[in-house]
């Protein structure tokens, strides 16, 4: 029988309709919300024992009623209706309340289970009734009470210990009867049961119903409230039912989501149900996961109380108090019940301990008050957050201040402002804060009030606008009427005066004008032409004929002339002329936004046909409009010609003769949706296709909640500018999504930009949202999307019928939770639809990083039933791409039908355009599948084939990535692409050479001939043929198809640097391990046979120990010696892998063990034992130690008695490096001799014998591809090994005692090396007496000898060297090498390097020339040194008269005043006249405004304007204005202020003058002083003695007249004389100035030519970046600037310098200029 939790409150809420009816009968009204609030919140606070879940105890109800109806100030009149209704439910209980009421024991019958007769055996338990039966029993009339049975007494609620009851004596004692559920011995009498309603229960107990069979009557139902209790010292036990466990599991959050809620639930279960140890285990098993259960048990064992009540640490006490295995507790005894109580106590402590999460205050700060959330609910949610994410109790007094501050800071804005203004906020408790917040919350306006307020404000704004407009119209009308009246009066403005008895018409006396017989009676006054606002029908809006093009139609029988307006979406009438419909629309016009109504459908006569149409009524519209809606029905065409616009139909005829049917005949001409599917598929499954079923929505998926990272804060990025074409392109998609509900308006602190992406090959745009910032702030989930590389491996090759479905708008099928929708908001403005604000997605958006994984998992769950019900087909899913494969066409058809049915029922939609139904050849994931084989699509091959040669490392990586997708079809891909891998690094110079071009073309050629590969069949074994060449592993994965081996994949990979340095027989082992690991993605664990040209298995089992490390060997053996999966075939020299193209011939068969045994180091005759006939025996050693924080190092070579060589090494040299140096020096000194050399360094010994050759083979790289340590010393050692005639390098133990020669020599070498390390200068070598001094003999050419003689040097006959003054003259070749080495060490300049060479013992002829040659060729120095090209001063281009050529610039003036920061300065280059305007901003709008409003009206239209490259000058606004006006806007070279020298100098002059004036006057407003500064600038003489004022106006400067007294004659100069003076100025001043300003011949001031390599200055270098970047190739030149490849702007010649010549194609040949097909382009080529 199912167990349910029923309380009085939940019972009344379930039957609230009956409660409301009963209250109505009592003449009161109750509401459900208040009923629940009073019962659970208000009445428990009255302290009368009212439980939160309600009670049917009449005494408690009466106490609450007394409190509520208290006449004093503490009464609650609003709760009277509810408590009297509750009282009536108890006094007059309905059927659904009676089973829960206790009837006082007034009858002889008591509550007792019926006895089982002694002569009857106990029947088996009856079957448990379903929940429906239980509910039916609740509504039946109560059965007569059986005799009282003490088993049915409920336990107390406050403690799980045995109850202490106050028995009520029954009127009639019950007979003693044995119970069937307890022991046979029962006391003769039992007390009456207490009342069933507890006084203050912690939780209402679950209701249990059980049926027992009476002695002589039918079975009756009895209620038992608890499963485990003490009755006559016997325990009654009822286990948990499946329905209880299911309800607890389903209707409560998991422990990981909300540990507090689940802990409270388990706590209530432990208190009310009193479970046993087994019940607790079952409860934990159902409600917790395995990991959560382990944590709870671990925490519980930490809280087992000891004898003193504190947690114990003794294992025996812990095991006794909280056993992990089932204990043998006897619950009928007090110790057993006490043990169970301790167990429950520890278990509850463990739940609370395990539920504590790590402290994360950031999570608490994210809890903010919702828009419509009450303060009490928000406080409860905040307290729950503190309990969940912090270790302290938020209700503790010491933490209330923290909670209060969080409540205030994270509350809504209006509540937060109110609480922050409270006085003494620290003294307020949490309840007081909630109470204050409730006051603000309750004062908020309701949505209805807010809407009414907005409507009222809108009406007030419209009234104000109408009154203002009427006021203006009244003024206009008054002015017009006054003018008319004045015009009618003719010449006499006033009428003649008329006497009292005189006629105003005929001027005769005796009658008035109304009785005048001469006045015509029937003449009508002509209607005046009224103006706007006059009250006349002819003058009303819309009365006149509209302009062309117009069209007259009959609307509802009334002829109406329409203005054809293609910009109007709907047709408009100015008058209703009939009834209006209830339909309204908002209309956005020039005067604002108003709501207008629509007419009912009117009949429109088109001449020969009738249509019905509904018009929008807009009285403010000047004319009736014929909009696009009616034009679309008419199929109208508008043609514009010189005669005017014509409205014609499709055939070119006037629109009046067009007939349109009543049923909108235009729909017949619509192009139907074309699909490649038969109609039967669309008709049978309309809900499965996007074309017929619309947008889908997953029916079985809950809304998705997006989790944010703990530190995530909202990000708001403004919308990028968007072109009109792009905006209109994505507008249709936005409108569609709004109509479908995929988008909705919102207000969100989050905002990301929307990007319009043009679809390739079309003019359509699609909206793409930039969600990169959102992706950074959301929690990452593990991607479960399948790998397309091995997805098809699960497809059986014999399944040759396929169906491919592509789900349409797949991500939009999954809804987003409302709390996650605001994350994806973006800006959108659409004035036509009245949208200006933010929109957000209600479905899962595209571009979100977790969308593919979330959708893939959701679709996989929804298709689980299909996979299990149809095992005869295979269904592959890659996100929204589905592939169904079947062995026959019939099976494929049936599977497809079931799949479409399943998709339609689950709410997904497939694209009919892209569907491939029941075909033998389909395209899926870029592959073509047919007959169990796959190959690349032509489109993918063409994409790779069209890729041009790369120009930088990024493009090389892009090409390799695109081609790498097809590597399974390219035999030997890694070998073909090997030359290109070196160009992928950014650190290496990019040089595209012939070998790279050949590799690039070879990959394309191999792709064009890509073969078809078979699909892997996981039911068959695989064979892998392997070979290795030049560090490239190549393989062919095959499967048997009859007698043939069909290729499944071509594999190739490059070995790592370590394995590449091994001998060939070991490289094959590394190659095999790499390809076996890669092939596992396709074989999926099936048996694999490996066949190679080597005896691979023997090498893997017993490899040589000198080549490979133990870790790598263990990895190889674990991978290759797995006999269950990998088998080795016999060595085969010719196999598919060895037949792949290689650049060298095939090797002959060999024995791998013998080859490895014969593999030697660098020198074949190098010995590790003493030579018997050695010329000398030397001992080497290196020393390195710390001395006062400095590492000192030295090296030495000794012979046991004398020091052969010793030297101190630079500080910081390691001991290994010193050992290598010492051994290398000993080998160099043994050149041409037989030598025994001892060393105690294992590192030096192994490097010379073994490791050196390995390093050399793998390019001196480590396993990570980095350079090895001591690379230069190892190279020197490997070279020095070949200098002696014979040599033996012997290892000896270090620091040995004894007198044998080896120990003595080793100790001497160690002592001398240590002494050398302590020396600060070089210790020269001391040769023994019997050893001659070694002298280097230089080789001189005839040119070297001539130069030596020229400087006075002589030849030394002994050394055969040329010497002068004790210095050796170096040959030119050796001198050049020496200078290069010294410059590489120091990078000194010419002068410093020459001084350094002069201090050496060598003399170099022509040293200055060689030094200059070396320094100029150093690329590093050219990039870093500050030297630049010096160009001579030139002439700037100026105008030939004033106002023609202007220079313009912005300059900032500090301090700012009144928001004005900048000064826009114009300088006329001819006269020097200056105009300056203060501005607040530095924008292109200001520049265009000043040109149009200031320069153009006063000085005429400029021809040329020069400026720098500031944003205000290069913007589209400025450049567009110049293009429209025909102005040549010249942008000067970047970072070259000399190009704008005139305006730059004027900026300085103006600011200097302003500074002086501010100091003199004390004014801070520099704008008031600007006119004086301009006065000085305009009257300052130039180098020709003329002021700008004189050049412009032809008169003396106004400053000269200030010194003279005023004379009236000075201002009476004849105008003609002035004009003649201006003419003379133009002839005598303007012409000579123009001649002086002429630039003359344009001579090139720099040495750069087209095709040269130059470095370009980096103007803003950061950190340690070089000062110069490049080199670049010069494409174009001018006399002062150059244009280089790779930089868009022109570069001034002073910002470039020549790069040192490098050999290659750019160093020879000439450039030739050719024309191209495009007249705006030229072609450069080298010959």
Swiss-Prot record:
Source species: Baboon endogenous virus (strain M7)
Essential cofactor(s): Mg(2+)
Binding-site residues, Mg(2+) 1: 806, 880-881
UniProt cross-references to Gene3D superfamilies, sorted A to Z: 1.10.340.70, 2.30.30.850, 3.10.20.370, 3.30.70.270, Acid Proteases, Gamma-retroviral matrix domain, HIV Type 1 Reverse Transcriptase, subunit A, domain 1, Human Immunodeficiency Virus Type 1 Capsid Protein
UniProt-recorded Gene Ontology molecular function terms: aspartic-type endopeptidase activity; DNA binding; DNA-directed DNA polymerase activity; RNA binding; RNA-directed DNA polymerase activity; RNA-DNA hybrid ribonuclease activity; structural constituent of virion; zinc ion binding
Name under which the protein is recorded: Gag-Pol polyprotein
Lipid attachment residues per UniProt (N-myristoyl glycine): 2
The family this protein is said to belong to: Belongs to the retroviral Pol polyprotein family.
UniProt short sequence motif PTAP/PSAP motif, positions renumbered to this chain: 109-112
Occurrences of domain RNase H type-1 (ranges): 1172-1318
Gene (name only): pol
Domain Reverse transcriptase: residue ranges: 736-929
């Amino acid at each position: 029988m199912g167990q349910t939790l029923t309380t009085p409150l939940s019972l009344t809420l379930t039957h609230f309709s009956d409660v409301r009816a009963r209250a109505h009968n009592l003449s009161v009204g109750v509401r459900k919300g208040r009923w629940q609030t009073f019962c659970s919140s208000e009445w428990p606070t009255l302290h009368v024992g009212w439980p939160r879940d309600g009670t049917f105890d009449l005494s408690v109800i009466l106490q609450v009623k007394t409190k509520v109806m208290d006449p004093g100030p503490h009464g609650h009149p609003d709760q009277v209706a509810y408590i009297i209704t509750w009282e009536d439910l108890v006094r007059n209980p309905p059927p659904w309340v009676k089973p829960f009421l206790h009837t006082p024991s007034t009858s002889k019958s008591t509550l007792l289970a019926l006895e089982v007769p002694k002569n009857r055996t106990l029947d088996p338990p009856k079957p448990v009734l379903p929940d429906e039966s239980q509910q039916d029993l609740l509504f039946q009339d109560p059965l007569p009470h059986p005799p009282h049975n003490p088993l049915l007494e409920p336990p107390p609620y406050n403690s799980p210990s045995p109850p202490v009851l106050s028995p009520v004596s029954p009127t009639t004692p019950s007979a003693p009867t044995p119970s069937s559920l307890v022991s046979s011995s029962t006391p003769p009498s039992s007390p009456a049961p207490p009342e069933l309603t507890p006084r203050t229960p912690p939780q209402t107990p679950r209701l249990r119903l059980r049926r027992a069979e009476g002695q002589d009557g039918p079975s009756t139902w009895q209620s038992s409230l608890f499963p485990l209790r003490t009755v006559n010292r016997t325990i009654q036990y009822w286990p948990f039912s499946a329905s209880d466990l299911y309800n607890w599991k389903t209707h409560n959050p998991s422990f990981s989501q909300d540990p507090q809620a689940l802990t409270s639930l388990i706590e209530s279960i432990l208190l009310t149900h009193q479970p046993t140890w087994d019940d607790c285990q079952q409860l934990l098993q159902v409600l917790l996961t395995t990991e959560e259960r382990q944590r709870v048990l671990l925490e519980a064992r930490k809280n087992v109380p000891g004898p003193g009540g504190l947690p114990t640490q003794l294992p025996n006490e812990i095991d006794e108090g909280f056993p992990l295995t089932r204990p043998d507790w006897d619950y009928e005894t007090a110790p057993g019940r006490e043990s169970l109580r301790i167990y429950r106590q520890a278990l509850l402590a463990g739940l609370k301990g395990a539920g504590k999460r790590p402290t994360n205050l950031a999570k608490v700060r994210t809890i903010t008050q919702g828009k419509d959330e009450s303060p009490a609910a928000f406080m409860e949610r905040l307290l729950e957050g503190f309990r969940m994410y912090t270790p302290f109790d938020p209700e503790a007094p010491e933490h209330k201040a923290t909670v209060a501050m969080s409540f205030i800071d994270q509350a809504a804005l209006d509540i937060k402002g109110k609480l922050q203004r409270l006085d003494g906020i620290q003294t307020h408790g949490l309840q007081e804060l909630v109470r204050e917040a409730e006051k603000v919350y309750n004062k908020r306006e309701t949505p209805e009030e807010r809407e009414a307020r907005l409507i009222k404000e809108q009406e007030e704004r419209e009234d104000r606008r109408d009154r203002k407009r009427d006021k203006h119209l009244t003024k206009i009308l008054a002015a017009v009427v006054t003018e008319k009246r004045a015009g009618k009066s003719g010449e006499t403005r006033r009428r003649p005066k008329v006497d009292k008895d005189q006629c105003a018409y005929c001027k005769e006396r005796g009658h008035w004008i109304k009785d005048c017989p001469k006045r015509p009676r029937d003449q009508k006054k002509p209607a005046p032409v009224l103006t706007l606002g006059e009250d006349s029908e002819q003058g009303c809006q819309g009365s006149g004929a509209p302009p062309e093009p117009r069209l007259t139609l009959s609307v509802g029988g009334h002829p109406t002339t329409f203005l054809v307006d293609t910009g109007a979406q709907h047709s408009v009438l100015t008058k209703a002329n009939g009834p209006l419909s209830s339909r309204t629309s908002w209309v956005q016009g020039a005067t604002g936004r108003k709501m207008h109504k629509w007419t009912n459908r009117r009949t429109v006569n088109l001449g020969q046909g009738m249509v019905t149409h509904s018009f929008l009524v807009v009285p403010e519209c000047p004319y009736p409009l014929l909009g696009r809606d009616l034009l679309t029905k008419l199929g109208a065409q508008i043609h514009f010609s010189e005669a005017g616009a014509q409205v014609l139909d499709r055939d070119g005829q006037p629109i009046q003769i067009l007939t349109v049917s009543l049923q909108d005949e235009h729909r017949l001409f619509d192009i139907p949706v074309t699909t490649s599917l038969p109609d039967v598929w669309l008709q049978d499954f309309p809900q499965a296709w996007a074309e017929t079923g619309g947008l889908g929505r997953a029916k079985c998926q809950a809304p998705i909640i997006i989790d944010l990272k703990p530190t995530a804060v909202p990000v708001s990025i403004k919308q990028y500018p968007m072109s009109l074409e792009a905006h209109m392109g994505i507008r249709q998609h936005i409108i569609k999504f709004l109509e479908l509900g995929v988008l909705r308006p919102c207000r969100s602190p989050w905002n990301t930009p929307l990007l319009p992406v043009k679809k390739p090959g079309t003019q359509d745009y699609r909206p793409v949202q930039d969600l990169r910032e959102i992706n950074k702030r959301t929690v990452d989930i593990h991607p479960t999307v399948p790998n397309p590389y091995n997805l098809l491996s699960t497809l059986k090759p014999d399944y040759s019928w396929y169906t491919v479905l592509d789900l349409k708008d797949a991500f939009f099928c999954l809804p987003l939770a409302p709390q996650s929708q605001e994350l994806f908001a973006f800006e959108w403005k659409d004035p036509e639809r009245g949208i200006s604000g933010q929109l957000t997605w209600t479905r899962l958006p595209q571009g979100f990083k977790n969308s593919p994984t979330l959708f893939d998992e959701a679709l996989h769950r929804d298709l689980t039933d299909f996979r299990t019900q149809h095992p005869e087909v295979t269904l592959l899913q890659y996100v929204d791409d589905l592939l169904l494969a079947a062995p026959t066409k019939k099976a494929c058809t049936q599977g497809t039908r079931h799949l479409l049915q399943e998709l339609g029922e689950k709410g997904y939609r497939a694209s009919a355009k892209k569907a491939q139904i029941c075909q033998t050849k389909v395209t899926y994931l870029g592959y073509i599948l047919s007959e169990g084989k796959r190959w690349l699509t032509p489109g993918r091959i063409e994409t790779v084939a069209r890729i041009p040669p790369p120009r930088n490392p990024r493009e090389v990586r892009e090409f390799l990535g695109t081609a790498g997708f097809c590597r399974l079809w390219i035999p030997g891909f890694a070998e073909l692409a090997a030359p290109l891998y070196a160009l992928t690094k950014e650190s290496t110079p990019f040089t595209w050479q012939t070998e790279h071009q050949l590799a690039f073309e070879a990959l394309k050629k191999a792709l064009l001939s890509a073969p078809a590969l078979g699909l892997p069949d996981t039911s068959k074994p695989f064979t892998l043929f392997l070979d290795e060449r030049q560090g490239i592993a190549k393989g062919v994965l095959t499967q048997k198809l009859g007698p043939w081996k069909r290729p499944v994949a071509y594999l190739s990979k490059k070995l790592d640097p370590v394995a590449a340095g091994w001998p060939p027989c070991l490289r094959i082992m590394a190659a095999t391990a790499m390809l076996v690991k890669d092939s596992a993605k396709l074989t999926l664990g099936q048996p694999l046979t490996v066949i190679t040209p080597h005896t691979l298995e023997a090498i893997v089992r017993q490899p040589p120990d000198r080549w490979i490390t133990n870790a790598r060997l263990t990895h190889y053996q674990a991978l290759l010696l797995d006999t269950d999966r990998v088998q080795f075939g016999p060595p085969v020299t010719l196999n598919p892998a060895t037949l792949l193209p290689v650049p060298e011939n095939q090797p002959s068969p060999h024995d791998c063990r013998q080859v490895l045994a014969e593999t030697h180091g660098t020198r074949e005759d190098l010995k590790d034992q003493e030579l018997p006939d050695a010329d000398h025996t030397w001992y080497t050693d290196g020393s390195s130690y710390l001395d006062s924080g400095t590492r000192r190092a030295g090296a030495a070579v000794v012979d046991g008695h004398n020091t052969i060589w010793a030297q101190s090494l630079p500080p910081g040299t390691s001991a290994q490096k010193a050992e290598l140096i010492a051994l290398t020096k000993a080998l160099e000194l043994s050149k041409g001799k037989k030598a025994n050399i001892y060393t105690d360094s294992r590192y030096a010994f192994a490097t010379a014998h073994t490791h050196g050759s390995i390093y050399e083979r793998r390019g001196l790289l480590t396993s990570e591809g980095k350079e090895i340590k001591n690379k230069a010393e190892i190279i020197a050692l490997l070279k020095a090994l070949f200098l002696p005639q014979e040599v033996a390098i012997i290892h000896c133990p270090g620091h040995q005692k004894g007198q044998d020669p080896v120990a003595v020599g080793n100790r001497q070498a160690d002592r001398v090396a240590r002494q050398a390390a302590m020396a600060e200068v070089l210790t020269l070598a001391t040769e023994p007496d019997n050893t001659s001094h070694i002298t280097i003999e230089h080789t001189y050419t005839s040119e070297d000898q001539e130069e030596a003689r020229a400087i006075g040097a002589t030849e030394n006959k002994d050394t055969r060297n040329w010497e002068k003054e004790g210095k050796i003259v170096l040959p030119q070749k050796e001198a050049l090498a020496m200078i290069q080495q010294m410059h590489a060490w120091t990078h000194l300049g010419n002068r410093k390097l020459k001084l350094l060479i002069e201090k050496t013992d060598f003399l170099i002829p022509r040293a200055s020339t060689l030094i200059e040659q070396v320094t100029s060729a150093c690329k590093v120095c050219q990039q870093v040194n500050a030297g630049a090209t010096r160009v001579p001063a030139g002439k700037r281009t100026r105008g030939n008269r004033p106002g023609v050529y202007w220079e313009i610039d912005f300059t900032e003036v500090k301090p700012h005043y009144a928001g004005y920061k900048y000064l826009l300065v114009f300088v006329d280059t001819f006269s020097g006249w200056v105009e300056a305007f203060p501005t607040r901003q530095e924008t292109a709008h200001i520049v265009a405004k000043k040109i149009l409003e200031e320069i153009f009206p006063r000085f005429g239209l400029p021809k040329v304007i020069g400026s720098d490259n500031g944003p205000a000058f290069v913007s589209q606004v400025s450049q567009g204005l110049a293009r429209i006006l025909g102005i040549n806007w010249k942008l000067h070279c970047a970072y070259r202020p000399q190009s704008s020298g005139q305006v730059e100098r004027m900026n300085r002059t103006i600011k200097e003058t302003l500074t002086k004036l501010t100091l003199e006057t004390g004014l801070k407003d520099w704008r008031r002083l600007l006119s004086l500064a301009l006065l000085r600038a305009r009257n300052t003489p130039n180098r020709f003695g003329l002021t700008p004022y004189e050049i412009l106006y032809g008169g003396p400067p106004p400053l000269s007249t200030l010194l003279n007294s005023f004379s009236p004659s000075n201002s009476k100069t004849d105008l003609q004389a002035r004009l003649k003076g201006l003419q003379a100025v133009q002839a005598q001043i303007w012409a000579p100035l123009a001649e002086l300003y002429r630039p003359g011949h344009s001579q090139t001031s720099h040495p750069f030519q087209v095709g040269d390599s130059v470095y370009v200055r980096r103007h803003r270098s950061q950190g340690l970046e070089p000062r110069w970047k490049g080199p670049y190739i010069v494409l174009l030149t001018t006399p002062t600037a150059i244009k280089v490849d790779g930089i868009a702007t022109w570069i001034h010649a002073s910002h470039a310098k020549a790069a040192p010549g490098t050999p290659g194609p750019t160093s020879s040949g000439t450039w030739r200029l050719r024309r191209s097909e495009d007249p705006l382009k030229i072609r450069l080529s080298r010959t």
